[in-house]
Amino acid sequence: MSLDKESHSRDYLYGRLLAVADVAEASTYAREDSRPTNAKRFFEAFSNHPYQTWDVIYKSLRPYLDRMGRGGSVRYERMINEITSMFEHDEFKNNSPLSPEFLHAYSCQVNELYTKKTNDNQEEE
C-alpha cells in the first residue's frame, strides 16, 4: 500500500488533505497530549460533507501552522496547496459523501508523512 501522488480522484485527494491536516496539527502537540486533532474530530462530518467540512478543518489548522514556525508551516502548506491544485474545480466544490477510497488515501498519506519524519530524524542522528 503506497501513496499514489498521481491520482486525481476527488475521494483520494480529499483523503490526502485530511491526512496532512491531521499530521500537521498533531506535530504541534506535546508528546503527552492525547487530545484528538480537528481532522479526527470532524472525520465523520468530513466523509459526509468534504467541501464544507474542509473549510472548517483548514481554518482550525491555521493557528497550528502559525505556531510551527516558517520551516514546518511551509512544508505542510505546500502539500495542501499541491493536493488542492490537483482537483478539478467542480470536483473540489462537490460536497457529496466520499467513498471509502478516501480512507485508503488517508492511510497512505499518513504513512508517508510519518515514514519521512522517521527517516529525517534518523539522518539527523
Language-model segments: which ranges?
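Intrinsic-disorder/low-complexity detector
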Residues: M1-E125
